[in-house]
Each structure stands twice: as structure tokens, then as C-alpha cells.
Amino acid sequence: MFQGAMVAIVTPFKAGQVDEETFRNLIEFQIANGTHGIVPCGTTGESATLSFNEHERVIEIAVEQVDKRVPVIAGTGSNNTEEAIRLTKHAKNAGADGALLISPYYNKPTQEGLYRHYEKIAKAVDIPLVPYNIPGRTAVNMEPDTIARLAKIDNIVAIKEAAGSMKQITDIIARCGDELVVLSGEDFLTFPLLCVGGKGVISVVSNIAPADMANLCNLFLGGDFDAARKLYYRLLPLCHGLFYETNPAPVKAALAMMNKIPSDELRLPLAPMSPANRLRLRQDLQAYGLI
């Protein structure tokens, strides 16, 4: 169920509120272009600045609009284990197919603390779980040995790995084998990860180029490695351009330039892109043929 290119979808806002109509339209754009899954309320979805009610509503909208056409993996992570359990229970009750849980941030747990955090959530909620390792945002790297321990838990089925290290990725796959699906959390590592046994990506770039990101995974998983490699190198400027500034400012700017969202409205403390980087991004989109 969890393989291919799954979009870490943005949460559009209008006058400070979740723009439900635009969000539904974005989901339809994704499914029409072959995206393999929808991942709402992640980093790209600005989960950190959604209220609990908004967070739950965005998941409900996603499940309703997708209507079982592709899997929905709902972001339900928190640095408070009990809050993560509450959000994950809601995702299950709403009909999500799985839950994506960022590692606890700010409180800097030990490896044992990380293990117990995910273990408790797994025991509390019977839904497929995808831990999310992104030490650049959490300040703690979940080490391969810890991930291998978590892979023994029945409903921990995959990991979104975004430590930026191919060594770590290969260590995880070597330790876990078929017990755990490894997904890239970084678009620019999608092809290298597939080459060492990973199964896909939870993608920011899929917001703006869903068909090509899905095709990259389809080609590779179908055995056409050379075509996949060529497409990867074509996508690479977008993989870099969407991170000229803190995600999701660039991807929202790109979607606005493409007329997929009415504006690139963000919630503080995130700010719009600088004019210089906005120009660079526009040039990338023009070169790719997206605008």
C-alpha cells in the first residue's frame, strides 16, 4: 500500500482560514495525475500551525475527497505522546489508511524515549504507522538500530527517512529487510533510495509535478531504470528549487504561480519568499514548462 510517489500536500489558506474548496481541488489535481497517495497535515501541510480542530478537519476532508481512490496517510505526530495518540485515533476513525508521525521535536528524547513513544502509539491505535525521521527539524536522529527495533512492531509498516544520509538509508534497509518499507522524505534522494531498495517518496515536488514524480517511481519499480534515471535528473532542479527557503513557502509560491491556489498565504512564523528567491523559482518553473 505504501509505495510510489505520495504527495505531502499543502494546506491552502484564505484570509487566515483553511480554504476547503481549494484543498479539494488540489486533491483532484493529484489523483488525476497519478499520485500514489495523499499525505495531509505533514510539514508541508503546516501541521505545526493548525489548531487541533483544523488538523482533524483537514484529515476528514482528505479522506472524504479521496474516497478510497488512493491511500491517505494522515500526519498525526506530536512531541507529546498523548496528543499523538489522540490525533492518530481521530485519523483512524476518520477513515485514513495510515498515520505519519514525526519524531518528537524540541524535547530531544533518547533513542529509548523514541522507541517508547512509537511503541505506545502503536499499542494504543491499530492503524498502519509511518514514523518520520527528520533530525534537521527535530534535533534528534532516530538511529538505524532504533528503527530496526520499531520494525518488529506489527503495525509500524514504513518509515519516512529524511536524515539526508544515504549511509543511514542503506543501514536501515540492511537491518530491516522486508519488515519495513523505507520511503524518502527528501525529493532529491528519491532515485538513490530506490536504487538501494527503498520503495518511494513522500514528496513535496509532487505538489507541482505529480505526474512526473509518480512516473519516476512507476518506471523504476517497473524495471525501466534508465528512463527513471533520466526523469530524475530532469526533476532535480525542482527538487532544489522548492527548498530555496523553508518549506512550504516555495511550494506554495509555485502553486500560486501555476494558478493552482489563489495565493501563497502562510501562517506565521513562516513568511513569504524573498523577491530574489521568488524570481529564481519562477525561472525554474518556466524552464520545466510548468508556467
Curated annotation (Swiss-Prot):
Residues annotated as catalytic: 132, 160
Catalytic activity entry: L-aspartate 4-semialdehyde + pyruvate = (2S,4S)-4-hydroxy-2,3,4,5-tetrahydrodipicolinate + H2O + H(+)
Principal place of residence: cytoplasm
Site feature: Part of a proton relay during catalysis: 43, 106
Cellular component terms (Gene Ontology): cytosol
Subcellular location as annotated: Cytoplasm
Matching Pfam families: DHDPS (PF00701)
Any one of the GO BP annotations: lysine biosynthetic process via diaminopimelate
Molecular functions per Gene Ontology: 4-hydroxy-tetrahydrodipicolinate synthase activity
Keyword Lyase annotated: yes
Binding site for pyruvate: 44, 202
PROSITE patterns assigned: DHDPS_1, DHDPS_2
Superkingdom of this protein's organism: Bacteria
InterPro entries in the record: Aldolase_TIM (IPR013785), DapA (IPR005263), DapA-like (IPR002220), Schiff_base-form_aldolases_AS (IPR020625), Schiff_base-form_aldolases_CS (IPR020624)
Keyword annotations from UniProtKB, A to Z: Amino-acid biosynthesis, Cytoplasm, Diaminopimelate biosynthesis, Lyase, Lysine biosynthesis, Schiff base
EC number: 4.3.3.7
Pathway: Amino-acid biosynthesis; L-lysine biosynthesis via DAP pathway; (S)-tetrahydrodipicolinate from L-aspartate: step 3/4
SUPFAM superfamilies: Aldolase
Assembly and binders: Homotetramer; dimer of dimers.
Family to which the UniProt record says this protein belongs: Belongs to the DapA family.
Function: Catalyzes the condensation of (S)-aspartate-beta-semialdehyde [(S)-ASA] and pyruvate to 4-hydroxy-tetrahydrodipicolinate (HTPA).
HAMAP family: DapA (MF_00418)
Name of the protein in its database record: 4-hydroxy-tetrahydrodipicolinate synthase
Native organism: Syntrophobacter fumaroxidans (strain DSM 10017 / MPOB)
